Amino acid sequence: MSFSIKNNQINGSDSVYFIGEVGINHNGDLELAKKIILEAKKAGFSAVKFQKRNPELSTPESMKSKLRETPWGEMTYLEYKYKIEFGKKEYDEISKYCKELEIDWFASCWDLDSLDFLLNYEPPVLKIASAKITDKVLLESHASSGLPIIMSTGMSTMDEIDKAYEILKNNPLAILHTTSTYPCPPEELNLNMIETLSEIYPENPI
């Protein structure tokens, strides 16, 4: 199965949709985020991807009050999460800037609140982080959007991948073999998994 993200054909063979991972590497600094976006555009990327969270919802209770050292000094983990999280003001500017540069942008959403937030910007595609592949309610909400979806597999088992696939299969869906080790030693890349996923899900770009 092939599908389009705007004018980009996604078919797993003769086309490439280059995604620059911004994630939270902007450290809550809008100007730094814009610099990363500009460099991605210069390098020929098709899109940039962020991570969107509601820190109150996505931070485990046991972690919220834990202290940690940060570039801004010692603070609780929850305070740190809020420090690096962009809100409407920042994403309004990011959306405007990406439109000016003619580069797509979207985000992996880690909770329902963040998904609702992102959908206001009419993203061309949604991204499922491998850490959320077992969140049935979140997957169902992504599926109900009707948008194309990119799903990372990370450290997921084949059973977990298949259960997620059953929820998302009616959407245009690309499945990524990804690693959760950064940086990843070459011997742990297990690139044969790309072929395995292609055999199991022949109708989907891998």
Protein language model regions, located:
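Catalytic cores and adjacent flexible loops of soluble metabolic enzymes
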Residues: 1-206
